[in-house]
Amino acid sequence: MGVLILSGPPGVGKTTVAGLLACRSETAVHLEADRFFFFIRNGFIEPWDPASHEQNQVVMRIAAESAASYAAAGYATTLEGIVIPRWTLGVIREAIEAAGVPVAYAVLRAPQSACAARVEEREGSPDIFDPAVLARIAAEFDDLGEFERNAIDVAGMDAGQAAAAVAARLEGGDLAL
C-alpha cells in the first residue's frame, strides 16, 4: 500500500473526498494533516503565517511519518491537507519515501469563488476566513509546475464524482511521484 497526498485550496472538498476514498477500501486511514497542528499547545504559529515555515516542516514530517506507518502496515492511506509544492510537499515526500512506501499526489481544483463560498459556510477559526489569506493560499495552486499533471479539476463535480476521478487517476498510476 502507498500514501495518497490529497491537496488543494481551502473549501475545495479535500476532507469529504478523502473520507469517500477511505470508504472504498476494507482497511483505510484518512489522516487530516491540519489536526497535527492542534498538538502544539504553546508557541503555535498559524500555518499560513510566513514565520511558521519551520513549524510547518516539523508538523508535516510527523504527519507524513504517521501516514507512511499506516501504509506500511497495509492500510490504504490518504494524508489530506494543504500541501503546496514549494511549502511542504518536499518534506512529506521525503518522509514517506524514506519509509519505503510509494507516494502519490493529487491536487483538487475548483474556482476560487466556489471554494471561498464553502469556507464561509464553516464554523471555526476566523483567520482562515480572511479573503486575503484564502486568495493567497488558492493562488499557490494556480501553477504547480512539474506537478501540474497531478491536478484534477473538480469544478461542477459532486463529492462522489470527485472521489471517483481521484480513484481512477490513482489506480491508473497517473498521480505517482
Segments from the language model and where they lie:
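Hydrophobic anchor at the beta1->P-loop junction of P-loop NTPases
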Residues: 6
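P-loop (Walker A) phosphate-binding loop of NTP-binding proteins
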Residues: 9
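ATP-binding Walker
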Residues: 12
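Walker A/P-loop
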Residues: 15
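Conserved substrate/cofactor phosphate-moiety recognition/catalytic segment
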Residues: 19-68
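Glycine-rich phosphate-binding loop used to anchor ATP phosphates in small-molecule kinases
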Residues: 55-99
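Conserved phosphate-donor/acceptor-positioning beta-strand/loop module used by diverse small-molecule
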Residues: 99-120, 152
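Small-molecule kinase domains that catalyze NTP-dependent phosphoryl transfer to phosphate-bearing small molecules
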Residues: 121-165, 177
